[in-house]
Amino acid sequence: MPSRHTFSCIDAHTCGNPVRVVSGGIPFLKGNTMLEKRQYFMENLDWIRTGLMFEPRGHDMMSGSMLFPPHDPENDFAILFIETSGCLPMCGHGTIGTITIAIEEGLIHPKTPGFLRMEAPAGLVLVEYKQEGKKVKSVKLTNVKSFLAAEGLEIETDELGKLTVDVAYGGNFYCIVDPQENFPGLEHY
């Protein structure tokens, strides 16, 4: 294995949220789906994520993506999301920033202009974009199906004590906390 690895990246942001698209030096990932490839990446190549997302090349809010050929020929491309917290199954702002960069820089070539079928580890995401000349002006995505995964779970926290929460899925799992006796609301923190 060579002692030096070179990656090409293009940085952008989505309303201030950073996204770094790795455009060169991407390794082969084993797996038949993006979910399997994500797992392989996390188990064998996480040094790439930490090297590109953390200081001195990144920062604590850095997000990024890597583009791959699709597994299904009906789709336009596949994507792996990397960030400081790990490899997300789906990332909304990362999708918007990546599509903008990828279309403007010619990294992906849509089968149907203005519309993309993107394979993410979370599943198929449909993307519409508007372009004026070479500039992408807007990106709209239809995410994977959302669902309520758990309702009324009781958890114990060090700072707040017992809380009742719901867990929802929308490409990632999210904890939903309504105001309650131990938690009056985010505006108090």
Please provide the spans of the model-predicted regions.
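A glycine-rich beta-to-alpha transition motif near the start of alpha/beta enzyme domains, typified by
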Residues: M1-D166, C175-Y189
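Glycine-rich ThDP/TPP pyrophosphate-binding loop and its adjacent helix/strand module
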Residues: G171
